[in-house]
C-alpha cells in the first residue's frame, strides 16, 4: 500500500505539512494508522508512506519562528537571504514563477510556492531532524518511503551559485537514507525525480528505485 501524505496540512493537496509526527484528522488518528499497518502486515502487505522533506508549510512552527525572529535557531532551518546578497539569484525560476518571496528586508526560498518554503538541506541539524522523522514512522511499522521532489533538496538558485546541485542532492540523500537504513536494512526507497531518464540515472547510486516518467509518458 502506498499512502500519500497523511500528515496535518491546511490545504487540500497536503504538501504543506504542519506536523510530521501526526495524522491529518480527516483520515483518522495515529491509532488508526497503527492498526492499518498491523492489519496490512498480518496479510503480508507492505506499507510505503509519502515523505515530503524538501519543504514544509509556511504555517509550520519552525518556519513561523524563523520568519518572526531572524536570530531564532530555526532561521537557519530554511533558506533566508538579505535582499542585497549577490551570491543568490533572486530571479531564479526552477519550476514556474519566481522561487524567492520577500518578507520585510529578507527573502526566503520556496521552489514550488511561497506557501511551502524549502528547508536548508545544508544544515546538519535539519538533516538530523529529517532522519528522526523517518525513524519515527519506521518505528510505527512503515516499510518504505516515497520521496517527494527528491532533486529539489538543492535546486536552481537556492544556494550559493557555485554549488554542484546534483552532487549535493546525492550527498544529502546518501546521508539521510543511511541514517534510516542503519536501523532498518530492508527499508525500501522510491523517489520522484521528475526528469528525463538520463537525469534520473545518477540517483540510483543513492536510492533503491525511481519512477520512470519517460516510460510513463510513452505508454
Residues covered by each model-derived region:
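Active-site and adjacent substrate-binding regions of carbohydrate-active enzymes
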Residues: 1-219
